[in-house]
């Protein structure tokens, strides 16, 4: 297992490459400029959205024992120019990249060590309308707001300490940044209300992906690690939303990338059971 010093060095190397490699620097500037925050996506003019959203006869839902970027890369390999893949970043709601500068090991930090996502999250709109907005809130449930960053460049692998990929293996993927509720502090919410909150947040994540004509979305055990949300409840919230009429035709594939520790009660097995993968 990697230690914090190794992960800090890796992140510093990632940032150095972003700042000094002409290609990465240019791509980062573009993705940062194109980053957008969706405060509340839904409004009364639903027909305008339906007109440009993609429609699929069916959606293939899959649970894989994999990391986020590794799963995304596999679904980009078939050369289909119409395929657009987005991944969900399990955000720290207050600070871009969470504890990546200090060697933290959660999902968001892993994404930031392997790609140019971190500087993109410092887009002025993201800082003002997402991070500052959440810092101004007094609860730990946070918000349905989503930050959308297109064409993030992944240029390191997903080893415990990510290593530089050969340049011909670099790839682009869109990133949806959103925070789950945090149950590590006392929160007065019933299981049914928590499930309803998750379903609302999941719908917003899906709508933003649909707005950008994403065909494959890579999700995961959203909020079920450091944020201490019950994985079976979260999995059922995802399952129920993806069975709703609007969302069951909105993507070609939905992938839940969840690393497995081999225990029968781990997040991978719980999500597999709920989503019918066993």
Regions found by a protein language model. Give the residues of each.
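Macrodomain-like recognition of ADP-ribose-binding/processing modules
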Residues: 1-217, 221-278
